[in-house]
Amino acid sequence: AVKSDRVYGLLTHPTAPCLPAVLAVAEYKKSSSGKDFLLAYNLGIEVETKIAEAISPRHYQQGFHATGTCGVYASATAASKLADFPIEKILTCLSIAGSQAAGLRENFGTMTKPFHAGKAAEAGINALELTELGWTASANILEAPRGFFQAHGGSYEPDSILNVLGNPWTFNNPGVSIKPHPSGSLTHPAMTALSDLIN
């Protein structure tokens, strides 16, 4: 699979789960404006990246793939925002999505790795539909003793989320970029140097 996600200085690839979810809801809703679309997309990216920054480094060290685990929150946030949910329903949607958070680094280098992002996108849409059907879920899926942060890393850094959502917007700082090569970012300097030598 070509890995063409946009990421720079982040701990996850937020576009991969977020954009498909926003596109699906926009196609279904049809009354959304471009401004609504961009706001939902940016909110999804913001939530995913801040959660990825807040979770303990053990999350990654223990084998979790943040694009799959944190990405469910991007797709659920973006989808529920574009669906114009009130805050209570957004929280329910996030909680339902959180119960679907998955992705293991053991599958890096296989065809299953990009599947993580696709399942994270799907999780947000499933959560949206279940919320619309009246499903209930915890209002504290992230910080509860048996919630996401404890289950997936053992702890979290509240300062990475509280009072920093949208301040600054991740889309602006550190920003997003298009990968110059369809591979992991650690290989990019060598690939760029090799391309320069060939050219």
Language-model regions: role of each:
Residues 1-53, 58:
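Hydrophobic alpha-helical hairpins/lids featuring a short glycine-rich hinge
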Residues 1-7, 50-62, 104-110, 167-176:
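Glycine/charged-rich beta-loop-alpha catalytic/anionic-binding loops adjacent to active sites
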Residues 10-16, 36-41, 59-72, 112-117, ...:
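Active-site nucleophile and cofactor-binding loops and adjacent substrate-binding regions
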Residues 43, 47-70, 92, 96-100:
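Flexible glycine-/small-residue-enriched beta->alpha junction loops
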Residues 66-68, 72, 77-199:
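Functionally critical mobile loop/hinge segments
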